[in-house]
């Protein structure tokens, strides 16, 4: 029997650096894990206002809150199976201008609340680039491909940030999800996601986000 209820809350504790600037973020989220819907309110508690675009942080607290993904019955849900022991994930984000972010997350559960402890490091963002100039305007919807390897779930996708004035800033995400106990492994599949910032104050020290996340098999399989 799953320890995950139809409606769950979660807490985010994120800390890290971007081009040497230290920050901390805390958040409170809620959603429906079996329907793939979630919302979160996030606050910069140290290091604000941030001298870089919020958008590089936004996927770490939602496309990062993986239990809130709707899975069909014929695909084993790797992450939900991992609880109550939980799981970890590690991610590398390679941007087209040479900037790199490394991220780790340790996810646990307390009652009807997930706890996410996130560590973030961003390096080599050009001073005149869209991140340090805060010229990004949110992520396009994306699709992650996922496959099993050595008891872990490997994810890979190509993301695109919308830019002020038009165009896109591209980034490849490589994620490794590791359950803290043996679970039934899924086959090759996809997860479609749409992440939006729905509200924020002028300096992005208080942000609200929502995400829809749905798993599926390949359309032409």
UniProtKB/Swiss-Prot annotation:
Keywords: Chromophore, Luminescence, Photoprotein. There is a cross-link at residues 62-64 (2-iminomethyl-5-imidazolinone (Gln-Gly)). Fluorescent proteins have become a useful and ubiquitous tool for making chimeric proteins, where they function as a fluorescent protein tag. Typically they tolerate N- and C-terminal fusion to a broad variety of proteins. They have been expressed in most known cell types and are used as a noninvasive fluorescent marker in living cells and organisms. They enable a wide range of applications where they have functioned as a cell lineage tracer, reporter of gene expression, or as a measure of protein-protein interactions. One of its GO terms (biological process) is bioluminescence. Contains a chromophore consisting of modified amino acid residues. The chromophore is formed by autocatalytic backbone condensation between Xaa-N and Gly-(N+2), oxidation of Tyr-(N+1) to didehydrotyrosine, and formation of a double bond to the alpha-amino nitrogen of residue Xaa-N. Maturation of the chromophore requires nothing other than molecular oxygen. The precise stereochemistry of the tyrosine has not been determined. The modification 2,3-didehydrotyrosine is found at residue 63. Coiled coil: none annotated. Non-fluorescent pigment protein that is lilac in color. Belongs to the GFP family. Homotetramer. This is GFP-like non-fluorescent chromoprotein. It comes from Goniopora tenuidens (Anemone coral).
């Amino acid at each position: 029997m799953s320890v995950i209820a139809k409606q769950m809350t979660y807490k985010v504790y994120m800390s890290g650096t971007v081009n040497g600037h230290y920050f901390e973020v805390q958040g409170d989220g809620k959603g429906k894990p079996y329907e793939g819907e979630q919302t979160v309110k996030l606050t910069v508690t140290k290091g604000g206002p941030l001298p870089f675009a919020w958008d590089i942080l936004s996927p770490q607290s939602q496309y990062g809150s993986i239990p809130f993904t709707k899975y069909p019955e014929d695909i084993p849900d790797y992450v939900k199976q991992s609880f109550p022991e939980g799981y970890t994930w590690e991610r590398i984000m390679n941007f087209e201008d040479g900037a790199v972010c490394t991220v780790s997350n340790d996810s646990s559960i307390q009652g009807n609340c997930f706890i996410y402890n996130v560590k973030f490091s961003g390096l080599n963002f050009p001073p005149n680039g869209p991140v340090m100039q805060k010229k990004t305007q949110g992520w396009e919807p994306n699709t992650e491909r996922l496959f099993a390897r050595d008891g872990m779930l490997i994810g890979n996708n190509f993301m695109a940030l919308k830019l002020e004035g038009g165009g896109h800033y591209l980034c490849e995400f490589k994620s490794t999800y590791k359950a803290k106990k043996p679970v039934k492994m899924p086959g090759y599949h996809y997860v479609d996601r749409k992440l939006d910032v729905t509200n924020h104050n002028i300096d992005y020290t208080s942000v609200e986000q929502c995400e829809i996340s749905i798993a599926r098999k390949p359309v032409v399989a």
